[in-house]
Regions:
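Carbohydrate-recognition beta-sandwich/jelly-roll modules
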Residues: 1-192
Length: 192
């Protein structure tokens, strides 16, 4: 069986009162980005591969109430199946742990979106200032095979968007607990 699991958490936050956080990739409504890059200029709803983000998280801050909602992927192992296609429906040829994170604003209210395996909509951002048609991937689940997926969902309060991002970053680092990577060569050896 080939599958793609998508989840949407609706909120009562109005799109016009909301600011978004996809760490390292999208802040506020991304309106400072050129029209050729993902932003509210192109669409009010976006989904991205979670490996494009510095942390696999989607979040929203409601400026009217000070409420925040975040979804953080809980995944320790990393695997990726390379694809031969850049757009459309893609059946993955191997194992991947990469899902997606995003948000939906089509009805004027915010929903946070996430799932597995990855989806990029309404456009796929393949390189600087290049948007192409969307992509949806499908993973194979063999008879008797088991897949476990988990995300952390968190509600909190913040006095403004800056505090929301700072609090989310601390929460993310506490949950993910990144460790230094042991490299084969020192910086000096690499520069030599």
């Amino acid at each position: 069986v080939y599958y793609n699991l998508g989840v949407s958490i609706p909120t009562d936050y109005a799109t016009d009162d909301s600011e978004f956080d996809l760490p390292g990739f999208w802040y506020h409504k991304n309106l400072r980005s050129p029209r050729e890059a993902p932003s509210f200029h192109t669409s009010k709803s976006w989904n991205f591969r979670e490996d494009r983000l510095s942390s696999p998280l989607t979040g929203v801050y409601d400026s009217r109430s000070g409420s925040t909602l975040t979804v953080l992927r809980n995944e320790q192992m990393r695997a990726e199946a390379l694809t031969t296609h850049q757009e459309g429906e893609i059946i993955l040829g191997g194992a991947t742990t990469i899902g997606y994170m995003g948000f939906d604003n089509e009805n004027g209210r915010v929903s946070l979106t996430f799932g597995y395996p990855w989806v990029e909509t309404p456009k796929r951002y393949i390189r600087k200032l290049t948007l192409v048609n969307p992509a949806t991937t499908f993973a194979c689940l063999e008879p008797g095979e088991k897949v476990t997926l988990s995300w952390y969902i968190r509600e909190s309060k913040a006095k403004d968007y800056g505090h929301c991002v700072a609090d989310t970053w601390s929460y993310c680092m506490d949950r993910i607990n990144p460790q230094p990577i042991n490299t084969l060569y020192s910086s000096e050896q690499m520069k030599a």
